[in-house]
């Protein structure tokens, strides 16, 4: 029986521990092709490269069962290049991550991890973005591997609805402390921006972007609530950004 073909990407770079853990998991399930950024691309969102060339190089040994390519572009670039040029056929699934840090709530908008998954969805490939709530480079991904495998197997068996990508966030706790898996809505939270203003040796101002994450959504059906209770959250994300509820109201405007 043929094994499914799985594309793996991320935004932390091809050498990040998170993607290595994800490769370990999905290699047990299917044939794997990895196309990931050569270096960190966190916070790139859905940026694509249009004003310069893209470069890719195979970094896995010839005898390796996993094909691995390093790409000079963004996470979205990686997925575009993989599906249209580097893979032997259209993949059965794309998994992105495992991200070092949360991509819950509004963070999905900024996330390169989720943009890789969303790009796959746009290309007609079922896709999942995985994130662990631990920003450290040496984060422990082993505790989450069984859950990642279970979710991936379910996606392959049951399918993901057309036009939908799954945003999966995993608490950084021991496996025994995970309370289960909850399908949720995205919490209505936001960042309060703060800039650390400094001067360079020439007296010119420059800024470091910092900020605070603020969640005023008290709903118990949100990803933030689930994660705070040590549940794994799954949010089905649509890439059709149409605000359908606003169409009727806007049609009442006078454009004459």
Where would I find each of the regions flagged by the language model?
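Short, Asp-centered acidic motifs that coordinate Mg2+ and/or phosphate
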Residues: 93
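Electrostatically charged, flexible surface regions
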Residues: 142-256
């Amino acid at each position: 029986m043929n094994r499914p073909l799985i594309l793996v990407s991320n935004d932390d770079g091809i050498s990040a521990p998170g993607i290595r853990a994800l490769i370990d998991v999905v290699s047990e399930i299917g044939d794997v092709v990895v196309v990931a950024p050569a270096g960190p691309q966190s916070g790139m969102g859905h940026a694509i490269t249009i004003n310069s060339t893209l470069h890719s190089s195979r970094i896995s040994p010839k005898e390796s069962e996993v094909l691995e390519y390093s790409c000079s572009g963004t996470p979205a670039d990686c997925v575009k290049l993989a599906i249209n040029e580097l893979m032997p056929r259209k993949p059965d699934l794309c998994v992105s991550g495992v991200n070092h840090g949360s991509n819950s709530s509004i963070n999905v908008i900024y996330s390169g991890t989720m943009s890789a998954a969303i790009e796959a969805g746009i290309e007609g490939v079922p896709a999942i973005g995985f994130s662990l709530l631990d920003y450290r480079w040496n984060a422990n991904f082993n505790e989450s591997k069984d859950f990642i495998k279970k979710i991936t197997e379910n996606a392959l068996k049951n399918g993901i609805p057309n036009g939908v990508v799954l945003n999966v966030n995993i608490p950084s706790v021991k496996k025994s402390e995970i309370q289960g898996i909850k399908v949720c809505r995205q919490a209505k939270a936001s960042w309060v921006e703060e800039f650390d203003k400094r001067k360079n040796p020439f007296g010119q101002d420059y800024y470091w972007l910092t900020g605070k994450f603020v969640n005023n959504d008290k709903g118990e059906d949100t990803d933030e609530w689930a994660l705070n209770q040590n549940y794994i959250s799954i949010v089905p994300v649509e890439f059709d950004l149409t605000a359908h509820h606003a169409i009727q109201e806007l049609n009442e405007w006078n454009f004459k």
